[in-house]
Amino acid sequence: MDEKHIENLEESLGGYKEKILEVNKGTLEWDRDLIFKVRTQMGYEIEYDANLQWGCSPTETLLTSVAGCMAIDVFYFLKKMKADIKEFRINFTGVRRPDPPQYYKSIELVLNISGTGLTTKKLDRAISLSQNKYCSVYNALRKDIEVKVSYNIKDI
């Protein structure tokens, strides 16, 4: 992939990165027990439950947010690089510290992608752009968290 193509790739991000809200707002209300309901400014709802019976934990949503943010970036970049993606899945694992604050000490993301026109060079570039420049969630993590990203390509 030449430098001109990479510049065009980054310029094309205007399609979805321009829609990012500079200020995000929402509300969180206690529902019952240790269950809280969140409503985003766009009207989406999430339930947090410390006991994990009625909703996910805040740390789970952090982990899913890292995977989701990277997925959107990588998928978008690969499409711009003319890859025809048939399947895209990220398996993720987070290992937390046992003592408070029990933040993630390591996160592993394994991208499983199948399609045509997929190369390691394209995937490495898409992941690099996401990690180093575009994934807001990834870049909001503590710097001492070890994040490992790998992938499996199935060219069909």
What are these regions (language model features)?
Residues 1-64, 75-156:
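Extended beta-strand/beta-hairpin segments
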